[in-house]
């Protein structure tokens, strides 16, 4: 597991089983039992706290990572690797995190 990968996860209800982008730093996946993730949704709102994803990123359809909904979950809720995001897409994720957390300068 490493930052920028997309995995299937069993999130608490009402969210349930869905893909998530791994957000925690790489070392967290080795040493920690809880990790931070961003859910991926088919609902694309085109807002600064979302990152559009799709077939070019290894996903079957157009969707978006929602950084407004980042959450920390037990690592054992991650079940199956889907794909990994490239450098430019992770730059977009970092920008969306800054926006979602109000860290814009």
Language-model regions, residue ranges each:
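Conserved functional hotspots at enzyme active or ligand-binding sites that engage polyanionic ligands
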Residues: 1-105
